[in-house]
Amino acid sequence: MKIDLNCDLGEGFGVWQMGDDAAMMQIATSVNIACGFHAGDPDIMHATVKLAKQNGVAIGAHPGFRDLHGFGRRPVPGITSAEIENLVAYQIGALQAVAALAGHKVTHVKAHGALSNVACEDDMTARAIASAIKAVDPSLVFVVLANSKLMLAGEAAGLPLAHEVFADRAYEDDGNLVSRKKPGAVLHDPNEIAERVLRMAQDGAVVSVTGKVIKMRTDTVCIHGDTKGAVEIARGVRRKLEASGITVAPFAGT
């Protein structure tokens, strides 16, 4: 059995840094790099790509709504399909150019924050993201929340998919993530999270906040770099998986 560990990195801005990218880069096998709209800038993007190349880690674009102040975690009411396509294509292209400068290659795309959350439940948003990815490069792997409208849009567009589960987030009974506004939405206990991820990988399922077992294909597990104790959590998850005979490797080539 093989599984990927992915992490959202490069989410600082200017002199401000978010999380310990250098440490996470030694644990993750794929990283999703902010492309300047919700976080990141050209220098941070370039430094993050170089760090990924040095560590043999696959890189992907992490496009979000243009909302630095809100870290891309606030929906944009009234945004059109064309506007979503444009902002996704723009951000993928930006990372592709920076990656070329650093001698690395973008292999996948994963939507960030509110853009992803809305797309998991809204057909128009999901289709617009998938359409933009396909137009830019149909070989890019689309990282999607398992069992979501993002997944259905990716399938309809004929894109290669990586089905994602979240190590440090709680799930509702319908398979969507519990809103960060609710208590208990983000998990922090490293041992609990490691055991949870092992069950996800072995059983192909997640357990909701009410105890409901939801079958989900698991190609990649996300550990958020901005979660408190992220490095310890990620290290514990990888150690638990490898100790159980599961190969931790990227879903796309580096």
Swiss-Prot record:
GO molecular function: 5-oxoprolinase (ATP-hydrolyzing) activity; ATP binding
Keyword annotations: ATP-binding, Hydrolase, Nucleotide-binding
Catalytic activity: 5-oxo-L-proline + ATP + 2 H2O = L-glutamate + ADP + phosphate + H(+)
Enzyme class: hydrolase
Gene3D superfamilies referenced in this protein's UniProt entry, alphabetically: Glycoside hydrolase/deacetylase
Domain of life: Bacteria
EC number per UniProt: 3.5.2.9
CDD domains from the UniProt entry: LamB_YcsF_like
GO biological process: carbohydrate metabolic process
Pfam annotation, one family: LamB_YcsF
NCBIfam families in UniProt: PRK05406.1-3 (NF003814), PRK05406.1-5 (NF003816)
Family per similarity comment: Belongs to the LamB/PxpA family.
Function: Catalyzes the cleavage of 5-oxoproline to form L-glutamate coupled to the hydrolysis of ATP to ADP and inorganic phosphate.
Subunit comment: Forms a complex composed of PxpA, PxpB and PxpC.
Family annotation (HAMAP family): PxpA
Protein name: 5-oxoprolinase subunit A
Naturally occurring in which organism (per UniProt): Rhodopseudomonas palustris (strain TIE-1)
Gene name of the encoded protein: pxpA
